[in-house]
């Protein structure tokens, strides 16, 4: 038996719950056969898969080392902890949870500082006045350096934060911060504001692939199946199934429906009796139903879709392209 594909997921909290729910919606049930406290698991519907429950930061590290094939972690951790990240890992799919921004935040009392250009002026003046560089508290050392350099800001020094970064200016350990935020409420509560152009990265949880993992034929096939489930669920979320039958339904009418409502005909045009199945974006359903009834349909039924499997899986195509020598 070949070595299993290793999929790393967060080991605790909301990220674990969201990751497990994401895979469950795709028809992949993450299970811990040896008990809830175990840090290894399986996918109930698949053989040749091992789930590794790790912290989000450990997942990024293990991806970089090639110790896991796929992992669920934030893009912020990937960009911060992996040098040349785009060469060593691939962001296969954004998962729609764990969203947060890495931002530059300064005291609200700095009323004349709104942009990185303003900050550059302030850091220069601060050094001239105090004979030392302005301090930036952060856990995101590499992201900070790259972003500040891209804006020409050089008169600062980083103070590595081990605790609540947003409190650093108030207690006097730094003049400003780079931190991650979801709503900005915590920053505001600590008297801080985000610079107008101070968003370093808009992050979310991603399914990430490691180039250096042992991508055997078995591992690739398992990855293909996992990604097929995910892509099918994502495509199903984009549409609702619309069915109707009436004699006035023809290819000309369907072409107009496509242009006006963004529908697709996954199984071709109407049958000789006018029976047709359409896939329609959710926000255009009522308009499409009205259109079809205006043209002769007596009944239009609408149903949710669980999965829509296409011949080509764009997620697996992305993985294969990344792994290609």
Curated annotation (Swiss-Prot):
Source taxonomy lineage? Answer: Bacteria, Pseudomonadati, Pseudomonadota, Alphaproteobacteria, Hyphomicrobiales
* EC number(s) from the headed UniProt entry: 2.4.2.17
How does its activity get regulated? Feedback inhibited by histidine.
Sequence similarity: Belongs to the ATP phosphoribosyltransferase family. Long subfamily.
Is-annotated flag, keyword Metal-binding? yes
Disulfide pairs? Answer: none
A GO cellular-component term linked to this record: cytoplasm
Source organism per entry reads: Nitrobacter hamburgensis (strain DSM 10229 / NCIMB 13809 / X14)
The biological pathway it contributes to is: Amino-acid biosynthesis; L-histidine biosynthesis; L-histidine from 5-phospho-alpha-D-ribose 1-diphosphate: step 1/9
The protein's predominant localisation is cytoplasm
One GO term under biological process is: L-histidine biosynthetic process
Does the keyword Transmembrane belong to this entry? no
Q: Which HAMAP family match?
A: HisG_Long (MF_00079)
Q: Which GO molecular function, any one, fits this protein according to its record?
A: ATP binding
Protein purpose: Catalyzes the condensation of ATP and 5-phosphoribose 1-diphosphate to form N'-(5'-phosphoribosyl)-ATP (PR-ATP). Has a crucial role in the pathway because the rate of histidine biosynthesis seems to be controlled primarily by regulation of HisG enzymatic activity.
Mind listing the UniProt keywords for this protein, alphabetically?
Answer: Amino-acid biosynthesis, ATP-binding, Cytoplasm, Glycosyltransferase, Histidine biosynthesis, Magnesium, Metal-binding, Nucleotide-binding, Transferase
What reaction is this protein's catalytic activity?
1-(5-phospho-beta-D-ribosyl)-ATP + diphosphate = 5-phospho-alpha-D-ribose 1-diphosphate + ATP
Pfam families per UniProt? HisG
Question: What protein am I looking at?
Answer: ATP phosphoribosyltransferase
Provide the cofactor list for this protein: Mg(2+)
Record's InterPro entries? ATP-PRT_HisG_long, ATP_PRibTrfase_cat, ATP_PRibTrfase_CS, ATP_PRibTrfase_HisG
Could you name the domain of life of the organism this protein comes from?
Answer: Bacteria
Subcellular localization is given as: Cytoplasm
């Amino acid at each position: 038996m070949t070595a299993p594909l290793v999929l790393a997921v967060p080991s605790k909290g909301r990220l674990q719950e969201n990751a497990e729910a994401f895979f469950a919606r795709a028809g992949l049930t993450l299970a811990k056969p040896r008990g809830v406290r175990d840090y290894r698991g399986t996918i109930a519907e698949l053989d040749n898969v091992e789930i590794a429950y790790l912290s989000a930061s450990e997942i990024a590290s293990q991806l970089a080392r090639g110790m896991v094939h796929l992992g669920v972690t934030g893009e912020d951790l990937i960009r911060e902890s992996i040098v040349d990240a785009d060469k060593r890992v691939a962001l296969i799919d954004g998962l729609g949870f764990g969203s947060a921004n890495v931002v530059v935040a300064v005291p609200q009392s700095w009323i004349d500082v709104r942009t990185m250009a303003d900050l550059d002026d302030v850091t220069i003046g601060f050094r001239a006045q105090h004979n030392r560089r302005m301090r930036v508290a952060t856990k995101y050392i590499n992201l900070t350096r790259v972003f500040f350099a891209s804006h020409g800001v050089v008169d600062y020094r980083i103070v590595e934060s081990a605790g609540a970064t947003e409190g650093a200016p108030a207690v006097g350990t730094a003049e400003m911060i780079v931190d991650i935020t979801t709503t900005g409420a915590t920053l505001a509560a600590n008297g801080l504001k985000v610079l107008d152009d101070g968003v370093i990265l808009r992050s979310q949880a991603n399914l990430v692939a490691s180039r250096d993992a042992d991508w055997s034929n078995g591992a690739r096939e398992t990855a293909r199946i996992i990604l097929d489930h995910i892509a099918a669920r994502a495509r199903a979320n984009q549409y609702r199934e619309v069915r109707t039958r009436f004699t006035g339904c023809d290819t000309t009418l369907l072409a107009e429906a496509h242009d006006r409502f963004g529908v697709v005909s996954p199984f071709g045009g109407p049958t000789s009796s006018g029976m047709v199945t359409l896939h329609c974006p959710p926000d255009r359903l009522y308009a499409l139903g009205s259109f079809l009834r205006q043209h002769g349909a007596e009944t239009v039924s609408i149903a949710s879709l669980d999965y829509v499997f296409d011949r080509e899986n764009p997620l697996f195509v992305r993985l294969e392209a990344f792994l290609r020598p």
